């Protein structure tokens, strides 16, 4: 993947205020598309230093990924991981694949941001963001309920997350 070329394309989209088109270009370039994806829409920006993306739609129905207009003001590796996180939610909410429990969906998505098992083409983020995303994964694991079936199902992945966090500087 030629990141320099991708950045040039994204800059051109930004110059013409074509943020939604830039996002479509990104998911196409990194093979993140899915039939349950209904498209992108805008959500309110949080701040110049933080962003929030969401996948919105009923479980089992098409999902719209809501992005802030300043999405492409952030580091491309971080943006790709954030978009991949939401595109995993698109898959998790697809007919025939619905994962009902929000804590399970979020744990899977944050785990993916660390280990890239579903989307190996997505680059790694900084150690700072790995620690942050690892912490979020553990938070959602805890919310599954102490000793629950879900916690048992994801015990091995939880250990992987803890190991990764502990190995980071």
Predicted regions and their residues:
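Short glycine-rich, low-complexity/disordered patches
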Residues: 28, 35-39, 97-98, 104, ...
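Short pre-active-site segment immediately N-terminal to the catalytic Zn-binding motif
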Residues: 66-83, 99-100
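Auxiliary, metal-adjacent structural segments of Zn-dependent hydrolase domains
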Residues: 2-63, 72, 120-122
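Long, well-structured alpha-helical subdomains associated
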Residues: 119-169
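Post-HExxH zinc-binding segment in Zn-dependent metallohydrolases
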Residues: 95, 101-134
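Exposed alpha-helical structural elements
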Residues: 5, 21-25, 77-78, 132, ...
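Hydrophobic core segments within long, regular secondary-structure runs in both alpha-
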Residues: 81-84, 110, 114, 138
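Active-site recognition of the HExxH zinc-binding catalytic motif
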Residues: 81-94
